[in-house]
Design a protein with these regions (language model features):
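Peripheral (often C-terminal) accessory segments that flank ATP-dependent C-N-forming ligase machineries
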Residues: 311-425
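Solvent-exposed alpha-helices and their adjacent loops that cap or buttress functional pockets
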Residues: 21, 36-38, 91, 113-115, ...
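Active-site "cap" helix and flanking loop/linker of ATP-utilizing ligase/carboxylase catalytic domains
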Residues: 247-269, 286-356
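ATP-binding N-terminal substructure of ATP-dependent carboxylate-amine bond-forming enzymes
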Residues: 1-95
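Active-site nucleotide/adenylate-binding loops and adjacent lid/helix of ATP-dependent enzymes
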Residues: 4-5, 101-182, 212, 236-252
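Internal nucleotide-binding/catalytic subdomain
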Residues: 157-294
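Glycine/small-residue-rich loop that forms an oxyanion/phosphate-binding "nest" at active or ligand-binding sites
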Residues: 68, 79-118, 122
Length: 425
């Protein structure tokens, strides 16, 4: 089988490494890929993740049997629709279903209509009305750009002034372009956060092992928000009881709601949850695998990924075997110092054989035989072990085996999870 994966980050590298485990897979193309993914797939760097017509032409010309569309942008732009129309079976939601991530206002309205627990909210298109609402509600309060903003369109404002400044930046200064033309303002929720990725064919939903993301740039959850500095799986806060509650009150109601709206969701539906004192609530939906959660979750998948993906496409997920290991995983992201703000790149990357076997490359390019840094998040290393403590220790050992000039990583990935595990005995 010939496969095509759209995207070029650490998440795509993790997906490709897992797909390669199937002996029927003879070739994987990655569009555009990156210098590190090139070790595991044929990278077609001249075709970007959003260049849908070129992707379709490439798939037809190269006899692609199955495609995986991983990032949010091409999904929102209708990559799955275009490939499916060209006769290429695909993993991922169509454009109508991808709106669950592409518009936060749509997602919030859906939850309100179908009684899916989430934070109280209002949607605004003009700054004065939004600012008046903030004055009335007070702080802390959350301001979100309605559209896609690379995971950076959310401001958790501690003061009224900070919230109003965020609104003005989004609506008036167009910090996120059209994505911030509408803003969602919602109540601040407190509690542990949990990420749950799931496979769904629109009827059946199978949750993957839970995970904990680390979004802030600095230790102790300080500093600006990033795309994610590391992840552990499973999440110790996510007990069997909470999982059952989420399945009944959030997961199944969501896919039923999407069906009822004429937008059946097939692919990976990501639930960003907060475990509040009044129960689990939805923080956000993503219409695809999370990054770096995927790099912690997929190494724990015991079943064949390609078979499970095809079952979501074919509507046969109810008959598929989806099994996860009871081990723990920890992914530590190595970034360029200064990320997510200003950073330098173009530095040579060296890594031990052991680290190379467990790494997922995100921001790197090849210059002849040398791998060079080419992004904020450069790569992630993942360790799997029988205990979370061992997985965390092993992941940091792997991180020591990678070197580049301005290497930076958080030193506390998994610390909160370990504390929670000890607290719960």
């Amino acid at each position: 089988m010939k496969l095509m994966v759209i995207g070029g980050g650490g998440r795509e590298h993790a997906i490709i490494k897992k797909l390669k485990e199937n002996p029927a897979v003879e070739k994987i193309y990655c569009l555009p890929g990156n210098g590190g993914i090139a070790a595991d797939a044929v990278c077609v760097s001249e075709i970007g993740a959003k260049d849908i017509p070129a992707q379709v032409e490439f798939a037809k010309a190269h006899g692609i049997d199955y495609a995986v569309v991983a990032p949010d942008d091409p999904l929102a732009l209708g990559a799955v629709d275009a490939l499916s129309e060209a006769g290429i079976p695909c993993f991922g939601p169509d454009k109508k279903a991808a709106v669950i991530e592409a518009s936060k206002a749509f997602a919030k309205d859906l939850m309100q209509k179908y009684n899916i627990p989430t934070a109280k909210y209002r949607v605004f298109t003009d700054a004065p009305s939004a600012c008046a609402y903030i004055d009335a509600e007070g702080a802390p309060i959350v301001v979100k750009a309605d559209g896609l903003a690379l995971g950076k369109g959310v401001v958790v404002a501690q003061t009224v002034e900070e919230a109003k400044a965020a609104v003005r930046a989004m609506i008036e200064d167009k910090t996120f372009g059209q994505s911030g033309a509408r803003v969602v303002i919602e109540e601040y929720m407190e509690g542990p956060e949990v990420s749950v990725l799931s496979f769904t064919d629109g009827e059946t939903l199978v949750p993957m092992v839970s995970s904990m993301d680390h979004k802030r740039a600095l230790d102790g959850d300080k500093g600006p928000n990033t795309g994610g500095m590391g992840a552990v799986a499973p999440n110790p806060y996510y007990t069997k009881e909470i999982a059952a509650e989420c399945m009944e009150n959030i997961f199944l109601p969501t896919i039923r709601a999407m069906r009822a709206e004429g937008r059946p969701f097939r692919g990976c539906l990501y639930f960003g949850l907060m475990l509040t004192k009044s129960g689990p609530k939805v923080v956000e939906y993503n219409c695809r695998f999370g990054d770096p959660e995927t790099q912690a979750v997929l190494p724990l998948l015991k079943s064949d990924l390609l078979t499970v993906m095809q079952a979501t496409t074919n509507g046969t997920l109810a008959d598929a075997s989806v099994e996860f290991s009871t081990d723990s995983a920890c992914c530590v992201v190595l970034a360029s110092e200064g990320y997510p703000q200003k950073y330098e790149s173009g530095f040579p990357i060296t890594m031990s054989e052991e680290a190379a076997a467990h790494c997922y490359v995100a921001g790197a390019k090849k210059d002849s035989d040398t791998l060079l840094t080419a992004g904020g998040r450069v790569l992630g290393v993942t360790a799997v072990a029988p205990t979370l403590r061992a997985a965390v220790e092993d992941a940091y050992h792997l991180a020591e085996g990678v070197d580049f000039a301005n290497k930076y990583c958080r030193g506390d990935i998994g610390r909160a999870a370990l504390a929670a595990r000890e607290e719960r005995g």
